[in-house]
């Protein structure tokens, strides 16, 4: 890669750590990842080595860019909502390799291409990939912005986990 090409790369390719907030804030708890990015920006100091992005439902294009780039972060954390039958507001870490094939259709990382791209980045590109997800309550059938009380209450502890794991400046 030429020096000019490297300069033209977006920050999300060049920073050592990339944190992606995924979801649709127009559909209730599905906006957890985006709301968590906003909470982190307002309540924590984001280190220079971390690129923190609210990517909404546009995560696939960004992941394709990373897969095709010769320069990429060493680690990626995806923040998202999911429904795996737990209590609304429960936050859990999911290993992308452990998403059961039967659950790929249900997994809310905005569907199969995203899950496959995360595995591609991990297995073939050497990127450490982690997923922090929050169990949603029932999602609305029509546009209804805002998190439920249970999911909103999960923001501070989830943000503390992210800060502890990714904002350390040893």
Model-found features: residue ranges?
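A short glycine/serine-rich beta->alpha loop
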Residues: 22-26, 103-106, 144-146
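Phosphate-binding/catalytic loops
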Residues: 114-170
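Nucleotide and nucleotide-moiety/phosphate-recognizing core
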Residues: 12-19, 27-29, 34-97
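A generic local secondary-structure boundary/capping motif
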Residues: 7-9, 66-67, 118-122
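Helix-loop-strand module that forms the ligand-binding subsite of alpha/beta enzymes
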Residues: 82-128
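Short hydrophobic segments within beta-strands
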Residues: 20-22, 132
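Short N-terminal or domain-adjacent regulatory/targeting segments
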Residues: 1-13
């Amino acid at each position: 890669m030429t020096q000019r090409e490297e300069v033209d790369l977006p920050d999300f390719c060049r920073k050592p750590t990339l944190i992606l907030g995924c979801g649709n804030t127009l559909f209730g708890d599905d906006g957890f990842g985006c709301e968590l990015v906003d909470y982190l920006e307002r309540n924590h100091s984001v280190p220079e080595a971390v690129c923190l992005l609210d990517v909404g439902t546009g995560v696939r294009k960004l992941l394709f860019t990373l897969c095709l780039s010769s320069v990429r972060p060493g680690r990626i954390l995806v923040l998202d909502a999911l429904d795996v039958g737990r209590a609304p507001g429960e936050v859990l870490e999911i290993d992308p390799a452990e998403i059961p094939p039967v659950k790929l259709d249900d997994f809310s990382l905005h569907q199969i291409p995203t899950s496959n791209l995360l595995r591609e980045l991990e297995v073939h590109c050497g990127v450490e990939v982690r997923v922090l997800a929050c169990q949603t309550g029932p999602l609305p059938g029509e546009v209804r912005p805002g998190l439920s009380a249970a999911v909103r209450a999960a923001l501070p502890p989830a943000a503390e986990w992210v800060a502890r794991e990714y904002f350390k400046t040893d």
